[in-house]
Amino acid sequence: MTPIRERWLMLTLAGIQFTHILDFMVMMPLGPQFTKVFSISDAQFGALVSAYTFAAGVSGLLAATYLDRFDRKRLLLVLYCAFTTATMACALSETYVQFMGARIAAGLFGGVLSALSQTIIADVIPFERRGRAMGIVMSSFSVSTVAGVPIGLYLAANLSWHAPFWLVVGLSLCVIAVACVTVPKIDAHLHQPERSSVVGGILETVKETNHLWAFLFTGLSVMTGFMVIPYITIYMEANLGVSGDDIVLVYFVGGLATLVSARVIGVLADKRGKVWIYQRLNWVVWLPLFAITLLPNGSPLWLIAVVYVLFFVIVSGRMIPSSAIMASAANPKRRGTFMALSGASQSLGMALGAVAGGLLISRDANGLVVGYWLTAAAGFALALLSLAVLNKVSVHANTPSTTVVSPQFPGPESG
């Protein structure tokens, strides 16, 4: 694959990540709106968030039965089209129950996209450039925060809460058209000798102790952040008195900072080592966790923005080396199944974090959120535990590429 085609592939995968991350991320800053529109509690809002991630976790487990049995491109397009349809159902929902069902459907189809994208990266990109590639794709998180979430919040404030989901649908349709051109045929894994049964493939994947440690590692890593993340906007509005317009500004500034930091962390992970970078970020993760949950009432907007930037640079930055570690911890023959199970572990970690965080916080008589700092304490404990588990994980530094690229690859530059 030429460098130009490789870059177009990374940008396409980043676009897919952007839309399905935006679909998930826009939920959390809209928390105050959903609690009012649907007349639900903070815990019920947490259930909306966790419903998506639980569904994504189940989807990841199911995907482990078929991810290595189809051409990566065809599977990616089918799942992405289904995700787009489910997001359209979210936009059309009118009640809490309808919206919950649509979120579950979006989780079932969207939950596999991240694992499949990481599998394609591991298939196509050599180990020595994998951290940089992960940084490009993972920067979609920052872009969704810089552009997608603020635009979504603006549309929700000026039109309705349905509008952000229509935005995701429109963008997804554009990405589908591009993906048809830029994603190559990847099917070398289909030609592996002595292919086992579906159940046998899963059993062979999970019977490797290194894989089990890796699944636990990634679950703990994402659970750290999701103890806190779903309730940030609710805390900002209820306790800090931040207006909707200022929340948009805070998200924009935070996303802009992580857009830069994601690329820097990806390059450093390749130069200094994925494990080394993850460890250093984890050692300081306590600072943003406690800072964002202990901000006092009356804090100036600039301080809130600084703390928010610190939080997402460090907390989300951990996911770049951790994703590269996971892609390299897989047995190459079982990479698709492994990454599906890895995605399931991440989704379940997010869901458990959102549910646990919702149980730790409550409201006082004045409607203020109390006990939010407990989510930070629990998150930091999980971060330390993930470091201990990481010591048990072995990575394959020279994982061979298993890519077969179609000779008639219709690269964008050929148009």
Give residue ranges: language-model regions.
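Juxtamembrane intracellular "pre-TM" segments in multi-pass secondary transporters
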Residues: 1-3, 184-215, 411
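Extracytoplasmic gate region of multi-pass secondary transporters
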Residues: 27-28, 211-252
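Helix-breaking motifs and short loop linkers at transmembrane-helix boundaries and internal kinks
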Residues: 39, 71, 92-98, 241, ...
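Conserved MFS/SLC helix-loop-helix module at the cytosolic interface between two early adjacent transmembrane helices
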Residues: 58-97
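Cytoplasmic helix-loop-helix junction between adjacent transmembrane helices
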Residues: 102-143
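Helix-loop-helix hairpin linking two adjacent transmembrane segments in secondary transporters
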Residues: 136-183
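A membrane-interface helix-boundary motif in multi-pass transporters
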Residues: 157-169, 361-381
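C-terminal transmembrane helical hairpin of 12-TM major facilitator-type secondary transporters
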Residues: 275-322
